[in-house]
Design a protein with these regions (language model features):
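Secreted, luminal/periplasmic, and some membrane-associated catalytic domains
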Residues: 26, 62, 107-108, 219-305
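A long, amphipathic alpha-helix that forms part
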Residues: 163-175, 192-233
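Second-shell loop/turn segments in exported
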Residues: 37-42, 65-66, 109-114, 124, ...
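Loop/turn elements at helix/coil->beta-strand transitions in domains of secreted/extracellular proteins
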Residues: 26-31, 57-61, 129-135, 179-185, ...
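Solvent-exposed loop/turn segments at secondary-structure junctions
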Residues: 37-40, 60-61, 67-71, 85-86, ...
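Bacterial N-terminal signal peptides
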Residues: 1-8
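Short, structured active-site-proximal loop/turn typified by the sulfatase FGly-forming signature C/S-X-P-X-R
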Residues: 41-88
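His/Asp/Glu-rich, glycine-adjacent segments
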Residues: 83-200, 284, 294, 300
């Protein structure tokens, strides 16, 4: 791709305390923008003047390969940490922790804000530990004090907040005095992903969502120039995955027609499914794997290890 109300809290120690360390106020600033579900070729399919503006004045990748599974939470946290899901622990948008007998779910505030789910060290934590102020208008992990450290300023995810309001906050952060002005800002737009899920790729609704997000980014770019920050602010636009319309009845696999679901928890979403045993039984796990692989030509079951 292109190269979650408000919680204005001071970063928990050992963070920056909301002020850049001496000598840290100067230097480049990074705005990390994620457009959820923005497929690699949307840049050429749809009118995207703001994104093209970034691409033409900088660098871009022509394609991307998401980590597995190609879902929002695992991929965003991989972007933030540089780790694979098996290493940082966010392996799905919702999944169990068998040791704690608890579930993580992207819509559950208590789990999203619980730092025990998040392994590795996201980039904003590294920055805060080095005395740099960070701010987040949404990004997976920013609502938890990971390693005891939060961004200096962050918002709890609220899909009802318009993209334009999010951009207004980012512009406000950029206008702060240098001592308090964030060196790293994250900004997240879910609108393209939502339109793709609800209406499909190639739909008018998806095109409208792309146009809306692009316009908001264009407004941000103009504000950066108006503030005289064009030479010190870097804008990095990323995505977590793409989407494609796919209909093939033969590819549908009904688990209960092939295995006994008693004693199993099944987490399914999109092209992926996880099967958890309520009581570990390696022999049964292997039998389930083999039964699925024998009956399904369009997918493959593997054991966790």
């Amino acid at each position: 791709m292109l190269a979650f109300g408000l919680q204005a809290l001071a970063g928990a120690a050992p963070g920056s305390g909301g002020r850049n360390a001496p000598g840290a106020a100067d230097g480049p600033r990074l705005i990390l923008i994620s457009i959820d579900g923005f497929r690699w070729d949307y840049l050429s399919i749809y009118p995207t003047p703001a994104l093209r503006r970034i691409a033409e004045s900088g660098v871009r990748a022509e394609s991307m390969r998401p980590v597995y599974p190609s879902l929002t939470f695992p991929n965003h946290y991989s972007i933030a940490t540089g780790l694979y899901p098996a290493e940082h622990g966010i392996v799905h948008n919702h999944f169990p922790d068998e040791a704690r007998n608890r579930w993580y779910h992207l819509h559950d505030r208590s789990s999203v804000e619980d730092a025990r789910w998040y392994g590795g060290e996201p980039v904003w934590v590294t920055a805060e530990k080095n005395g740099l102020v960070t701010a987040a208008y949404y990004f997976v992990g920013t609502e938890a004090a990971i390693g005891g450290v939060s961004p200096s300023h962050w918002h709890s995810f609220d899909a009802s907040v318009p993209g334009g309001d999010r951009v207004t906050q980012v512009i406000d952060w950029l206008a702060w005095p240098e001592a308090r002005r964030p060196r790293l800002i994250t900004l997240y737009f879910e609108h393209v992903d939502r339109a793709g899920h609800d209406f499909g790729s190639g739909s008018p609704e998806l095109a409208a969502a792309v146009a809306q997000v692009d316009a908001n980014i264009g407004r941000l770019l103009d504000a950066i120039e108006d503030l005289g920050l064009g030479d010190e602010v870097y804008v990095l636009v990323v995505s977590d995955h793409g989407q494609a319309s796919y209909v093939d009845p033969e590819a549908t696999f009904v688990l209960r027609d092939h295995i006994d679901l008693a004693g199993l928890d099944v987490v399914a979403g999109g092209a992926y499914a996880w099967i958890y045993q309520e009581e570990p039984d390696p022999e049964r796990a292997r039998a389930i794997r083999d039964a699925i692989n024998a009956a399904w030509a369009h997918g493959r079951a593997v054991l966790r290890d």
